[in-house]
Regions:
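A short beta-sheet element
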Residues: 67-108
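Basic, amphipathic alpha-helical recognition segments used for DNA target recognition
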Residues: 5, 91-142
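Non-catalytic DNA-recognition/assembly elements of restriction-modification systems
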Residues: 1-17, 23, 137, 141-179
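A structural connector/turn signal
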Residues: 52-53, 80, 125
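Sequence-specific dsDNA recognition surfaces
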Residues: 4-17, 31-60
Length: 179
């Protein structure tokens, strides 16, 4: 089944805010994520909650989509320890359909074919960006939940395989150099 993202999720832009040295809410920015869309390091709260509306606070399972610049990626918000809001670099995608896993949606948005499709529709010259309308109209292929879980499982195994191959190569290099 294929559905438009705008029909299965609420999409809102991230928040523009000025950082403080100390705060009680984390202001998530694209620089906090590595190439695979994973958080790089522990985050420091740098926004004051008195100035943030509740609707901007991220909820577990929200999908963040970095829509500005040349590096577009999707990541699922999992942080349960600290309150966070997304910066304007992101669209926050909150699923309203229960038949799609947030992790599957992030995988789908990160898939090379989807990335190419989105890049072809990006606007701007010096700072390219993907518009909310483009995201809303993006057709998402939605298999059943079991298939979604299988896709995610195979993807995790593939990532582990890549990591193990890299470790093996590093150990080989070390062994050759130490002889």
């Amino acid at each position: 089944m294929k559905l438009k993202l705008g029909d299965i999720a609420k999409i809102q832009t991230g928040l523009f805010a000025n950082n403080f040295a100390d705060g009680d809410i984390v202001y998530l920015q694209a620089k906090h994520f590595n190439e695979e869309g994973l958080l790089k390091y522990a985050l420091h709260p740098d926004l004051n909650s008195n100035e943030i509306e509740q609707r901007h606070l991220l909820k577990k399972g929200d999908v963040l989509f970095a829509a500005k610049g040349t590096r577009n990626f999707a990541a699922v918000y999992q942080n349960k320890k600290q309150a966070c809001v997304a910066s304007t670099s992101f669209f926050v995608i909150r699923l309203i359909e229960k038949n799609i896993l947030p992790e599957y949606l992030a995988w789908y948005l990160n898939h090379p074919n989807t990335q190419q499709l989105l890049k072809n529709q990006a606007i701007g010259t010096s700072m390219v960006s993907i518009s909310k309308v483009v995201l809303q109209n993006l057709e998402i292929h939605i298999p059943d939940l079991k298939t979604q879980k299988n896709i995610l499982h195979v993807t995790e195994l593939w990532k582990k395989e890549k990591q193990l191959k890299l470790q093996i190569e590093t150990l080989r290099e070390q062994q050759i150099q130490n002889q």
